[in-house]
Amino acid sequence: MGLFSMFKKESNEKPDISEIAYDYDGYDIAFESGKTEPKLYSEINNIVTNNNFDINNISEYKNLNINSDYDTFLTFYDSWLEELKNNNYVIHLDNYTNITDFANKINQLLDRINSKKKIDVDLITNEYKEELKKYSFMGNDIEENFNYDVLEANIVAQELRKIGYELINFFIGYDNNDKTIIKIDDIEKLKEIETKIK
């Protein structure tokens, strides 16, 4: 059950953050030595960057094509992710990220991949504030372990779908809190690549 379906339920109790489903996609792209072809990461890179960033410029990717072991992959993955973040293709989202800043960075990312579409930052900010009130039942303080980032990501994901994009993050055995977007039309292609990696 998604975030906004849950809020339609009649209840006199404060919603529990643990009940909120992640309303965005995650992809497990962890390398398997002897099985995973490095070129698959080039295909992922092209989807994420809309062919605007050449992964072959990363020396660690060249090394992965020569020495395909897990340690080499981790070195490549860290460098690749850093390059994507430095070039505004990936956004870090954690509990300290402001919703307005996150939404603005999403629009910068849309610019980066040559999209003419935008999400409404003011609408998202106001919607987030309204949803947040539902976790402060009868004026009580929000619990210390509240996952603000999950709520932010879910709201932004809903708005992105309206303009044809999906919010995603990658897993390599753990969630690194780094998000990016892809065209909804590319979801099946990315899922197919994921099955080839594993």
What kind of region is each of these model predictions?
Residues G2-K198:
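Contiguous interface-forming segments/domains that mediate binding rather than catalysis
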